[in-house]
Amino acid sequence: MSLLTEVETLTRNGWECRCSDSSDPLVVAASIIGILHLILWILDRLFFKCIYRRFKYGLKRGPSTEGVPESMREEYRQEQQNAVDVDDGHFVNIELE
């Protein structure tokens, strides 16, 4: 069974195009999948930076501090801040929440 929906054949009058029955369920399903794939590809290209930045940075919210005493949380924040505050002339201070 062929998935071709359009066939060009040589006739006496020249080249003609004979289309097969487009109500074939396989042809309809392939068309729908093709259109959805094209739409998703276009959206991916348009929103590439937003989507992948969200996956890369948005889902990483750092280690959980649930059940950790406040003093240890503050110590962790201070360590993170010290790692950033190497040289105030070249680095921007980042306030951790």
Curated annotation (Swiss-Prot):
Forms a proton-selective ion channel that is necessary for the efficient release of the viral genome during virus entry. After attaching to the cell surface, the virion enters the cell by endocytosis. Acidification of the endosome triggers M2 ion channel activity. The record marks 41 as: Seems to be involved in pH gating. Belongs to the influenza viruses matrix protein M2 family. The modification Phosphoserine is found at residue 64. It is found in: Virion membrane; Host apical cell membrane. A lipid is attached at residue 50 (S-palmitoyl cysteine). The gene is M. Cytoplasmic tail plays an important role in virion assembly and morphogenesis. The lineage of its organism: Viruses, Riboviria, Orthornavirae, Negarnaviricota, Polyploviricotina. Keywords: Disulfide bond, Host cell membrane, Host membrane, Host-virus interaction, Hydrogen ion transport, Inhibition of host autophagy by virus, Ion channel, Ion transport, Lipoprotein, Membrane, Palmitate, Phosphoprotein, Signal-anchor, Transmembrane, Transmembrane helix, Transport, Viral ion channel, Virion. The chain crosses the membrane at residues 23-43. Residues 1-22 are virion surface. The record marks 37 as: Essential for channel activity, possibly by being protonated during channel activation, and by forming the channel gate and the selective filter. GO terms for biological process: protein complex oligomerization; symbiont genome entry into host cell via pore formation in plasma membrane; symbiont-mediated suppression of host autophagy. Homotetramer; composed of two disulfide-linked dimers held together by non-covalent interactions. May interact with matrix protein 1. Residues 44-97 are intravirion. GO terms for cellular component: host cell plasma membrane; membrane; virion membrane. Its main location: virion. This is Matrix protein 2. The M2 protein from most influenza A strains is inhibited by amantadine and rimantadine, resulting in viral uncoating incapacity. Emergence of amantadine-resistant variants is usually rapid. Residues 61-80 are annotated as: Disordered. GO terms for molecular function: monoatomic ion channel activity; proton transmembrane transporter activity. When the channel is activated, one or more imidazole moieties of His-37 probably become bi-protonated. InterPro entries: Flu_M2. It is a single-pass type III membrane protein.
